[in-house]
Regions:
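Short, flexible, mixed-charge glycine/proline-rich loop motifs
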Residues: 9-21, 39-43, 63-67, 90-102, ...
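Intrinsically disordered, low-complexity linkers and terminal regions
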Residues: 31, 61, 68, 98-104, ...
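Short Cys/His-rich "knuckle" micro-motifs
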Residues: 33-36, 57-61, 80, 84-85, ...
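Short Cys/His-rich Zn2+-coordinating modules
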Residues: 1-13, 31-35, 49, 82-95
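Cysteine-rich micro-motifs
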Residues: 38-55, 78-91, 123-142
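Intrinsically disordered, low-complexity linker/tail regions enriched in polar/charged residues
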Residues: 7, 14-17, 74-77, 107, ...
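Short cysteine-rich clusters marking metal-coordination/redox-active sites
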Residues: 23-26, 49-52, 73, 105-109
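Amphipathic alpha-helical oligomerization segments
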Residues: 62-76
Length: 146
């Protein structure tokens, strides 16, 4: 179920992506039997190409390593310790390599600028866990009005 959290929102996918004939991330056309079945509740059958799936797996693995450290470290919530900084840097490098969009703070809903202190933030929704980020200290801006 966690892998579904890294899928694009279902409503943003094309019919070709929903049917599994194209990668959900890069839109590369997939021949029958090619690609990795990502599963889905409901009629959609999304697939990913090997390159994108490997990239997303590395990103998820480094995120969870960073998160797991942060929930047990007494220092990391106010700014990373050396290990937390190394784990965060590893995750950010994987994100950059994968061409992922800028991180957004779950609290203030603004993009997190390069160099800002950040920490992973995981919470549960009824449809599964959500992997996000928070500014490591106070958010620089108030949350925009809804």
């Amino acid at each position: 179920m966690v892998l579904l959290r890294v899928l694009p929102e279902i409503h943003t996918l094309t019919p070709t992506q929903l049917s599994g004939a194209a990668c959900v991330w890069c839109r590369h056309a997939l021949r029958p039997g090619e690609g990795i079945d990502l599963g889905s509740p409901g009629p959609a059958r999304p697939h990913g190409c090997l390159s994108c799936c490997e990239s997303k797996t590395r990103s998820l693995r480094t995120y969870l390593d960073w998160y797991d450290h942060g929930i047990t470290c007494l220092r990391c919530p106010t700014g990373p310790c050396d290990r937390g900084e190394a784990l965060g840097a590893a995750h950010l490098a994987v994100r950059e390599e994968a061409g992922q969009p800028p991180m957004r703070c779950c609290a203030c809903e603004t993009d997190i600028a390069p160099g800002e202190l950040v920490r992973p933030y995981l919470w549960e929704r009824p449809d599964g866990p959500v992997l996000g980020y928070l500014h490591a200290r106070d958010c620089p801006l108030p949350r925009p009005p809804s």
